[in-house]
Curated annotation (Swiss-Prot):
GO terms for molecular function: RNA binding; zinc ion binding. Residues 748-842 are annotated as: Type DYW motif. Signal peptide: none annotated. Keywords: Repeat. GO terms for biological process: RNA modification. It comes from Arabidopsis thaliana (Mouse-ear cress). This is Pentatricopeptide repeat-containing protein At3g22690.
């Protein structure tokens, strides 16, 4: 406003002077007479045109030397108008067009980004019979590099060899740059290695080529060879590229060495280098160092602010990112579209609609709404803030709806749990890329539509140009793990290996979890052991795999190994270790781990950790100690804590304490069906049928229903699901016959049905029949009649397996010499020759 005020208060005399100013006569005279010396003084296209008119009047428009210089000077200006004028002059004098004239035009068009025109001029020169020189080829290759015209560049390389310029340093540097920019790094390296002489441009082109692709390690290695072995002094471009390579590698140690080299070598640090250093430190999680650099060089640099803000967003430090944005505004730095992307993304992650609207207002006021990526970010923000109507208004106004735009809509629906709407949008997309497929597959998995996710993945295989990546396979592996389908799990692992998908720590961790959930702990641990870079999540997955397999001792060994390797366990890792102790009955070790959380590792126990301890103590029969732990909690115990106690009371048969725990649950979570079911189980086991009936009546009055028990089994790639009491399976007569056979043979070996699992006051015969229709027994019988002798039977149940079915499975495994692997909602049961891995402790 101050500047505007100064303009408004100019005196009339000043206004008159400023509005009547005419072009300087001195400038006019410098370009009026057409001489080579006056051409140098022409600074604008109008002056060049004036010079050309003067040249024509003087009859010098046929002077090759002067016309060539006019074309060159016009190209140097680099505007579309000056290039068109240069080409017009060139066209009128083409009969005596020179190599220098062509070089000027090719270079001018390439430098201005008009690369296709530059390439056409190069080809036109070749066809005109004018021989190129050592400058022509680099200018042509520059155009090919910028436009990624790989075919044209390769043809130019052929001409270079044919015409004897292959050993020229300037030409060789251009070839290295061209191949590197086009991603042909092997070809670039071949030219580089064959060079008899290399300068800083040669090394920088190769290093930057590696750094911009997925060969950051090669970029770093080549840099140190350059400065140590060859003693070539790098320039600022070299330094920016090698610093960015360290950032990609997240290699703080090497990044520090590069920064030390900069300080010791006396290389002048410019803004781009500082931005690259900040980016590197942020990506290496050295946030404090990045912040010191940022503060040292000030907040007045736009690129530096953008580097800081975008990395804050990437780290999830969204409030800090917005702080940088506010600092820019206070410092008078005008945010650009990159700044706005970080700001909008921060609002999106925070789900802060007020700040998001403020960013949207800034976008509209500053004309950024024409940028597709800005609109895509706004759509994402509004969808995450549950403002779908606003998101769709932006979507409808966009004239250029890219695949990224559509992906934002699909992702927004997935984020809001609207899987059907996401699917409908996905189906109508005019174009789909791998992100589209990954988004919808992930949405289906999040919606527990696991089989549908796998079907979509199979459909994706027929799409030309769409190849699964690590993100795809993580979703599919997760779906497979939830289904417990081991054959599918093995195929997924084979698919990853066959298609060369990189097994990084995230995908590897997902595969460990997948095989663990599918009852194959050996494969899970094999993948874990193959990972070269294991983070806390990978170790936690391995600990969980051993815990689910009933190998509590090995799970604790892994937990200790992780700590010995210098990794700090997080809350999730402690859950895995405590769960292992609970499943294995390791009370003392569980206590030691629990009390070490805050004391040794600085991790405050949360509800879930107390729940694990209550479960551990309760299973061991230490109910009074479990209650004391609950009473000593620093926070109010939630319904999950009390449910752990209730489950323990059922195992121990403590009716009074079970009723107390159930009462607490019904206050905290009155809709929780499981607590009513558990309490009714306790009453039924104690023969207190009236109390059980009251619980059931209370459930009915509140509209609560026990979820039906379902068990699934895969036979020859097809999933068969059974529900307790359901007799609709087409093989039901054969299943019933097998159940009768197993029951008789198990009875001869001493199996007695556990009638306490029937929660109805009916006669003994009816109870036995009801037990025979439990879903896991139906699945087990179908497995026995449908699979080959000696093969493993794998069953997945949605609820906890009852004691009668557990006992029944042990007898069946012994009678038929089968391994039965039963996964319930709590753990795995590996049953062999009448014995279970859980030791009847579950």
């Amino acid at each position: 406003m101050a500047m505007l005020g100064n303009v408004l208060h100019l005196s009339p005399m000043v206004l008159a002077t400023t509005t009547t100013t005419k072009p300087s006569l001195l400038n006019q005279s410098k370009c009026t007479k057409a001489t080579p010396s006056s051409l140098k003084n022409c600074k604008t296209i109008d002056e060049l045109k004036m010079f050309h008119r003067s040249l024509t009047k003087q009859g010098l428009d046929n002077d090759v030397s002067t016309i060539t210089k006019l074309v060159a000077r016009s190209c140097e200006l680099g505007t579309r108008e000056s290039l068109s004028f240069a080409k017009e002059v060139f066209e009128n004098s083409e009969s005596y067009g020179t190599c220098f004239m062509y070089n000027s035009l090719i270079r001018g068009y390439a430098s201005s980004g008009l690369c296709n025109e530059a390439i056409l001029l190069f080809l036109r020169m070749m066809n005109s019979g004018i021989s190129p020189d050592k400058y022509t080829f680099p200018f042509g290759l520059s155009a090919c590099a910028k436009s990624r015209a790989k075919g044209n560049g390769i043809q130019i390389h052929g001409l270079i060899v044919k015409m004897g310029y292959a050993k020229d340093l300037f030409v060789q540097n251009s070839l290295v740059h061209f191949y590197a920019e086009c991603g042909e790094l092997d070809s670039a390296r071949k030219v580089f290695d064959e060079m008899s002489e290399r300068n800083v441009v040669s090394w920088t082109s190769m290093i930057c080529g590696y750094a911009r692709r997925d060969f950051a390690k090669d970029a770093v290695d080549l840099f140190f060879r350059m400065v140590r072995d060859e003693e070539v002094t790098p320039n600022s471009v070299t330094m920016v590229c090698v610093i960015s390579a360290c950032a990609k590698l997240e290699d703080l140690e090497t990044g520090e060495k590069v920064y030390a080299f900069i300080r010791n070598s006396g290389i002048e640090v410019n803004d781009l280098m500082v931005s690259a250093l900040v980016d590197m430190y942020m990506k290496c999680n050295a946030i404090d160092v990045a912040k010191r650099l940022f503060d040292e060089y000030g907040a007045s640099n736009l690129d530096l602010c953008n580097a800081m803000a975008s990395n804050y967003v990437r780290q999830g430090l969204t409030r800090e990112a917005l702080g940088v944005f506010n600092l820019m505004m206070d410092s008078g730095v005008r945010p650009d579209r990159i700044s706005m992307l970080s700001a909008i993304s921060s609002c999106s992650q925070l789900r802060n609609i007020l700040w998001g609207k403020s960013c949207h207002g800034y976008v509209l006021r500053n004309g950024f709404e024409s940028w597709d990526n800005i609109c895509n970010a706004l759509i994402d923000m509004y969808m995450k803030c549950h403002r779908q109507d606003t998101a769709f208004r932006i979507f409808d106004r966009m004239s250029n709806k890219t695949v990224v735009t559509w992906n934002s809509i699909v992702a927004g629906y997935v984020e809001n749990g609207e899987v059907d709407a996401a699917w409908e949008t996905f189906e109508t997309m005019p174009e789909k890329n791998i992100v589209s497929w990954n988004t919808i597959i992930s949405g289906l998995v999040q919606g527990s539509l696991f089989e549908e996710a796998i079907e979509v993945f199979c459909s994706m295989q027929s799409q030309e140009g769409v190849n699964a990546d690590g993100v795809t396979m993580m979703s599919i592996a997760s779906a497979c793990g939830h289904l417990g389908a081991l054959d599918l799990a093995k195929w997924i692992y084979y698919y990853i290996e066959k298609n060369g998908i990189q097994l990084d720590v995230r995908l590897g961790t997902t595969l460990v979890d997948m095989f663990s959930r599918c009852g194959d702990p050996e494969s899970a641990m094999s993948i874990f052991n193959s990972l070269t870079n294991r983070d806390v999540s990978a170790w936690t997955a391995a600990i969980g795999a051993m815990a689910m397999a009933g190998n509590a001792e090995r799970a604790i060994e892994l937990f200790d190994d992780m700590i010995e390797q210098g990794l700090k366990p997080d809350g999730v890792a402690f859950v895995g270790a405590l769960t292992a102790c609970s499943h294995g009955g390791l009370v003392q070790q569980g206590k030691e781990i629990f009390y070490s959380m805050l004391k040794l590792h600085g991790v405050s126990p949360e509800d879930v950790h107390y729940g694990c301890m209550v479960d551990l103590l309760g299973r061991a029969g230490l109910l009074e100690e479990a209650v004391q732990l609950i009473e000593d909690m620093p926070m109010e115990p939630n319904d999950v804590i009390w449910n752990s106690l209730l489950a323990a009371c059922r195992v121990q048969g403590n009716v009074e304490m079970a009723a107390y725990a159930a009462e607490k649950i019904q206050v905290l979570a009155p809709e929780r069906t499981g607590s009513y079911v558990l309490l009714s189980n306790v009453y039924a086991s104690a023969g207190r049928w009236n109390d059980m009936a009251k619980v059931r009546l209370s459930m009915k009055e509140k509209g609560l229903r026990k979820p039906p028990g379902t068990s699934s089994i895969q036979i020859r790639g097809k999933t068969h699901e059974f529900t307790s009491g359901d007799e609709s399976h087409p093989e039901m007569p054969n299943i019933e016959a097998m159940l009768d056979e197993v029951s008789q043979r198990a009875s001869h070996l001493g199996h007695v049905p556990d009638l306490s699992n029937v929660l109805m006051d009916v006669d003994e015969k009816e109870k036995i029949f009801m037990l025979s229709r439990h879903s896991e027994k139906l699945a087990m019988a179908y497995g026995l009649i449908s699979s080959n002798k000696g093969t493993t039977i794998r069953i997945v149940k949605n609820l906890r397996v009852c004691s009668d079915c557990h006992s029944f499975a042990k007898f069946a495994s012994k009678v038929y010499n089968r391994e039965i692997i039963l996964r319930d909602n709590n753990r795995f049961h590996y049953i062999r020759q009448g014995k279970c891995s859980c030791g009847d402790f579950w």
